[in-house]
Amino acid sequence: MASTTVAGQNSDVRIEVISQPEDFTQVTEVVRDAFGHQARDGVYLSMNPGWDTPEGVVRGAGRMANRFTTVSKNNKGEPNAVFLKATVPDPENAGQRRIVGMAIWAQQSAIEGHGDQPPKDLIKELGLESIFPGNEAEQRYAAACMGSLHKRREEVIAEKATAAEPAVFVLDMCAVDPKFQGKGIAKKLVQWGLDEAKRRGGLELLLEASSMGRHVYSKLGFKQEGPEIEYDVEEQFAHRDRPSNIFMRTGDGQ
């Protein structure tokens, strides 16, 4: 029987800030297995052509590593994006650890110096021209999906521009290897963000929740705001599958 903490969670799980780009191959495999093989998330599948091939993993890891190496800092010197990994002892390699969960937390704000500003050109910011070279329709579709997904997030960021604390802390992505789900790993990744937001001055936390993740988020104090997120896409793409997502937030002063 694995050792557990008093809370009943597996004590072999470690949550650590990623410090080397080499980790992103395993991180990308976790995302692939959770969003691709398990959830069949339509937006993930469309934005990651070849996601289930070795080449697709290399491309995905490269994009994540590029974001990692270009992280900006706020006016307090804190990174505006933090990449987390959850590791457990590798069952196939004694003495080594294996990445089985990941999260990206981002500080965002409409005010310079208080966090990354929401992107003005999604095709450029997401590198969609390199993902879909010469295919403007697919570039527009991916941008429309992400723009719709983050619409309420960006409205809240704009609303906070005149607040005493104009920044928010956003869960940009969270995934756990399907073989290691149900062990409290997602909860630990989210709790790290709650603690970090408090350390950064009590920032409000925002996220877009899939059907799989929302029960974890609600237990940790996130509340749904508004109805299901609607995707505003061109008619030619209306038939495509897109995942259920809702906008959730903690409220001010967390």
Language-model features and meaning:
Residues 176, 182-195, 219:
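Conserved acetyl-CoA-binding loop-helix of GNAT-fold acetyltransferases
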Residues 177, 210:
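Residue-level recognition of the GNAT/N-acetyltransferase active site
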Residues 45-83, 87-94, 158:
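Active-site rim helix/loop that mediates acceptor-substrate recognition in acyltransferases
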Residues 84, 103, 174, 207, ...:
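Conserved GNAT-family N-acetyltransferase fold
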Residues 169, 197-209:
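Conserved GNAT acetyl-CoA-binding A-motif
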Residues 187, 199-200, 211-231:
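Conserved active-site alpha-helix within GNAT-family acetyltransferase domains
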Residues 14-41:
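A short beta-loop-alpha structural element at the N-terminal edge
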Residues 71-75, 93-175, 181, 229-241, ...:
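Conserved acyl-donor/pantetheine-binding loop and adjacent beta-alpha core of acyl/acetyltransferases
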